[in-house]
Amino acid sequence: MYGQVERKRVNFGKITNLDYLPNLIQIQKRSFDWFLQADVKDETKRRHQGLEAVFRETFPIESPNNDMIMEYSHYILGEPKRSPQECKDTDATFAMPLKAVIRLIIKETGEIREQTVYMGDLPVMTEQGTFIINGAERVVVSQLHRSPGIFFSYDMERDVFSARVIPYRGSWLEFEMDNKGILIAKIDRKKKFPATLLVKSLGHGTNEEVLRLFYSSKKEKIAGATSKDLKKILGRRTINDIINMETGEVMLEAGSKINEDNISILKEMKVKEVELIEFPKGKDNPILINALEKDGVNDYEDAILKFHSLMRQGEPSTIENATTELTRLFFSPKTFDLGEVGRYKINSKFEFNNPKEFSGEKSRVLRPADIIETVRYILNLFSETENYYPDDIDHLGNRRIRSVGELISNQLKTGFSRVERVIKERMTVQEIETQTPQLLISIKPITAVINEFFGSSQLSQFMDQTNPLAELTHKRRLNALGPGGLSRDRAGMEVRDVHYSHYGRMCPIETPEGPNIGLILSMSSYARVNDYGFLETPYRTVKNGKVTGQIEHLTADKEEYHYIAQASGVIDEKGELKNKLISTRHRGDFPFRNPSEIQYMDLAPLQVVSVSTALIPFLEHDDANRALMGSNMQRQAVPLLREEAPFVGTGMETRAAYDSRICIVNKHDGVVTSVDAENIVVERKGGKESDTYQLTKFKKTNQGTCFNQKPIVGVVHSEINGKVSKVSKEKIEVTGENGELKEYVLQIGSKQYSPIVSAGEEVKRGSTLAGQVVVGEKLDEMGNILVKGTVLADGPAVDNGVLALGRNVLAAFMPWEGYNFEDAILISERIVRDDVFSSIHIEEFEIQARETKLGPEQITRDIPNLSDKAFRDLDETGVIRIGAEVKPGDILVGMVTPKGETDLTPEYKLLHSIFGEKAKDVRDSSLRMPNGFEGTVIDIKRFSRENQDELPAGVEEMVKVFVARKRKLLVGDKMAGRHGNKGVVARVMAEEDMPYMEDGTPLDIVLNPLGVPSRMNLGQIFETQLGFAASKLGISFETPVFDGAEESDVDNFCKEANLPLNSKFKLYDGRTGLPFMNEVFCGYIYILKLAHLVEDKIHARSTGPYSLVTQQPLGGKAQFGGQRLGEMEVWALEAYGASHTLQELLTIKSDDMLGRARIYEAIVKGIHSIKPGIPESFNVLVQELRGLALDIIITDSEGNTVDISDYEDEYSKSKKKIKFETIENA
C-alpha cells in the first residue's frame, strides 16, 4: 500500500455539511441498547424500560390463595458462547444467556428463597446492527404505526366529526354522531350508547351538571323584559331544570328550547330570570342535549348501573360491579395502557386548551379529565370553534416508529404473561415446602416467543446483503405493514402519499415500485428517532433574522407552528439573512416572510432525502420516478472484482461505506505495525498495547455475493539489507551493505508514516521501517461519530473507503444498428476481457448424515456403481478437495444410505468382509452439483458429533461445501446507471468494431439517446460530461444533492480539460473507418451491474418432474419445470390450423402418461407414427364434475359404457371412436 497516490477530490457543495450526519445505523443500535441496558454497571439500578420493564410488569406474582409471593430483583446477562462468525459457520444463533435473580417469599414463616434462574438465551445484536439467527444474518425492520393518543377525524361523506382514544394496550373508546344527531360513545367498536351515559358514570350525574361541564351560561331577565328582549331568547336552551316551586313539578327540563308558550308559562310562574346556554359562535348545537334525552338517567348511580348492564348483559348489576368494570376498561394499569407516548400525545393535545389540567401529568391510564376534555373538543369541532381542528392521521406527528427494542419488549410481554399463568398454576399444585423459583418458572413460553419473533415475524427479515448500501438501507427501513400495522390490500392512496410532514424525516423518493409503494419507506439522511418514537430532523435556529450556530431537532408536530427557511437562503458574513423576503416552509405552504418572522433554517439540502437517493449526483435534474428507480437499483448492484469509486459522486459515498460497518475501522489512535491479507496489527499510542484486526476473506453473503476485505493501510518495508543511518519525521535513510543509500519518504498524500526503527539499527530486506499513523474512532453517548477512525480495510464494493458499486466507462449516446433499441446496451469486448464488470458469486451446498431406522448414513468414498472418473476429486473420506473445478452432476460429498436389509447369507457376509461397503445393500445419496451451477470449490466445513460440534437432533455429521464462480458480463445481464437508466446487454462487440474517437480510443459502451428525453433523467448527461473532465484531469468530483455543480462549473472544468463545452465528438465506425454523420455526445458514466444475471434466469428442460395430480410438468427454474403453453398460445396454433402440433403439445408433451412412455419407446426404436392417449387433466376434470354431483359416463360408438382406467390399456389395441355424454343427476 506504500506509495499509492490518491485521487484529488473537488467538492462543489456550498452549504452541505456531512459532519452533522447522525450515525446511520443508530436507530438499530440505540433501540437495542435501550432494551438491554447492558452497559449499566449496577444491575439493580436499571431504568424502568425495555427488558427491565417487562420483568417489573410481570412481578411480583402472588399465589391464588395468598400464601406466597414471588418477587424479582434484577437480571444478569452472560457472555455469548460463540463469536458471530462461528454462529454463521455452525448455523447457530448469536445469543447470550439471560438469568434473573428471583425471590420466593413464604408469607406465613417470612422465609425468603432466592435463586438465580436461567430464563433462556436472548439473541444479541452484532456491532453491525444485525442478528444472527440459525446461522443467517437478519435485520429487525422498524415499524411505522399509528401513535397511541386521542385523535379527531372528519368524515367528508357523512359530514361528521369523530374522536378515537387509541391506547397502546386495551379497549378503544370512540365518540361520534349517529344518524339521529345523537353524540354516541363506542367501546371496542361493538358496544354503542349515548356519550352522556359515560360522562354521568364518571360522577357528573344530572343533566344540569353535564351541561355546565361543557357550556358556559348567561342569565336573561323575563320579568319586566320588553318584547324585543324576549324575542332574542327565543330558540335558546335552558342550562338547568325550571321547577314550579309550589307543586315541585319540572316545567322545563335542562336543555329545553325556549318558545313563546314557554315564556308565557314562565311569566305565569313569576320567574324573574332564566339561565341559558351560551353555545360557541351562538349556533344551536343539540347533539349533547339529544344524547341527554336518549340516556334516560339523571343521577350517577343509575348511570353507572345502566353502563354495566350494557357492557355485561345478563350479569347482576351492583354499584361495586359497575365501578370495577369501568375501572377495568380505562383506569387499571393491568388492562389499559396508553404508554408514555399516548400520555405525551394527550397532554400536548389538551395542554393548549387546558394547561392547568394537563401539564406535568404522567399517568399511563386514562383519567376522567381526558374523557371530559375529548367530549368538549368534539363539541367544539361540531360548533366550528376557532383553534379546534380535526387531526390528519397521515401527519408524522400521529405516526411513530416502533424499533427493535420495543418490538422485542412487546413479544416478551406476551411470553411473560404465559409464564405468570404457569407460575400461578404450579403454586397451587406443588407442596409449599419444596417450592423454589427454579421449579415454579417455566421458560418455554419465553423461548417460544423469541424464536417465533426472530424466525417468522414479518418485521424480522433476511438481510439484504447484496452490497453495503443494501445492508445500510435495510437497517434504516420503515415498514407500515406487519402486526398492528396496515395491510397491503386496505391501505389507500392517502396513507401511501408523500406528506409535507415527511420533510427531513422520511425520504419522498425511496420506496418500492408495486403493491408496497408508500408503505415501505426509508429514513432521511439526518433524521433520528426521539425517546417517544417520533422522527426528528435538525434545523439551525434563527434569532432576529440571524442564523445561529445552534442546532435543534424538531418533531413534525413541533414544526407546525414555525416558519422555516430553506438551506439555500443567502446569508452574509455576519450570519444574517440577506434578502428582505425569504421563501419559507410553513405546514404545507411556501409563503414569503421577513427574516424577523423566521425561527429556523434547514441544515442541509440533502436532509430531505435518504442515503440511497443522496448518492445520485445531479439528482435535481432527474424526474422523481426515475430517481426512485435509481435509488432502488443501487441497492441491487453486485460488488465487482475490481472496485472503482465514481469519478462523479456526491460526497455521501465515504460516509455510507463507513457507517455500513462493512469496512474495518480503527478503534484507538496508534501506528500500524504489521499488515497481511488476513490480519492488521495496530500498536496503540504509548506502545503498551496492540490490537489485531482480523479480515474476512471470501465469505458468502445472504445473497450469494462475495464478502472480502482488503487492507488499505500499510507499512514501509526496507528494500535492501543494511543499517538505518538517519531517522526523522520526514524520512528514513538506510545504507546498504555495498554503501548505497536508500531514502524512504514518510508523507505520501494524506498518509503519514511513523518510524518504528531507530538510527543505527540493522535491517534486512523486508524488515518494517515505519507504520502508517492511524486515528481511533470516537463516539458520543448517542452513538454519533465525533471523530472518524481510519479505515484499515475495504469491504466489498468499497474503494479506499469510498462506496464503489460500479465502474466508470467511456460511453456514447448514439443509436447503433438497432443493437441498443429500447434500452438495450451495446458493450465492447474489452469490458469482458479485462474483467471490468466481472464479479465473484459463492454458493453453499450442505449435506447431513443422519441416523436412520436401518442404520446410520455414512459419508464415504465407497459408493456403488460409479466410474473412477466420478471419484477423481474426492479425498479418502469422500469429500471433494478444495480447488476442484466442478460442473453440474459432479459429486461434492459421497454418502450412502442403508436400504432395507434382509438376513445376510454366510456367502454374502464373506463377500462383504472381503470387499467392504460396496457389496452391502446401500443406496447412493451423495451431494451433487445441481443443474445450472459450476465453479471452483473454495472452502469445506465439516462438523461431527465426534468433535463435540453442536448439531441438530438426529444428525451425526454435516459437511458444507462452498463453490465460487467468476461471472463475466454476458448478453442478457441487466445494467443500470444511478439515474434510473436501466437496460440489458444486447451484444458484446469486438473492440476493433466499436466506434472510436479521433485519437483512436474505442468506446466501452453505447447507449440509446432516445432513453433520455422522455424519461427526463438529465442527470446522466451532466454526469457523463463532468466524468470526462474528471478522467482527463485525474481528479474526482463531489456534487451534493441540490447543492452541486452548476452548468458554469461543468463548463469551466471542460475548458480546463480541453474538452468541447457540449461534450460532442467526431466518432468513426470501427468496421469501416468512416466518420459518423453527426458529432456524438460522449463521456464517462458510472454503470452498475445488477443482481439480475442472465445465468440465474436462463433455463431449459427436456424431461423432468411432473405434478402429482395433473401430471403436467412443474413450472419455474427452481423446480426444473417446463414452459407453460397457455390458452392464448393454443388460440394461436388453432388460428394457424396446426392441429398435429397442438395435439402433441396438449398430450404427449404434457400429461398423457401413456403417450409419454410410448413416444420414448418410439424415438428409441425409430418409429415415426404415434397415437396420443387421454390427457390426465381430462381425468381430473371428470372427477371434478363428479364432485359437483354430475355423473359423467363415457360410451363407445355403440353406446356401451367404457371404464376410463381400463380404456387406457385397451387404447393401443382398439381403434374405436369415443363419444362423451353428460347425464345430470335428478
UniProtKB/Swiss-Prot annotation:
EC number of the protein: 2.7.7.6
Catalysed reaction, written as an equation: RNA(n) + a ribonucleoside 5'-triphosphate = RNA(n+1) + diphosphate
Keyword field contains Secreted: no
Keywords: DNA-directed RNA polymerase, Nucleotidyltransferase, Transcription, Transferase
Coiled coil: none
One term under GO cellular component: DNA-directed RNA polymerase complex
GO molecular function, one term: DNA binding
A Gene Ontology biological process term: DNA-templated transcription
InterPro entries registered for this protein in UniProt: DNA-dir_RNA_pol_bsu_ext_1_sf, DNA-dir_RNA_pol_bsu_external_1, DNA-dir_RNA_pol_su2, DNA-dir_RNAP_su2_dom, DNA-dir_RNAP_su2_hyb_sf, RNA_pol_bsu_bac, RNA_pol_bsu_CS, RNA_pol_bsu_protrusion
Subunit-level organization: The RNAP catalytic core consists of 2 alpha, 1 beta, 1 beta' and 1 omega subunit. When a sigma factor is associated with the core the holoenzyme is formed, which can initiate transcription.
Family statement: Belongs to the RNA polymerase beta chain family.
NCBIfam families the record matches: rpoB
Chain's role: DNA-dependent RNA polymerase catalyzes the transcription of DNA into RNA using the four ribonucleoside triphosphates as substrates.
Protein name: DNA-directed RNA polymerase subunit beta
Native source organism of the sequence: Leptospira interrogans serogroup Icterohaemorrhagiae serovar copenhageni (strain Fiocruz L1-130)
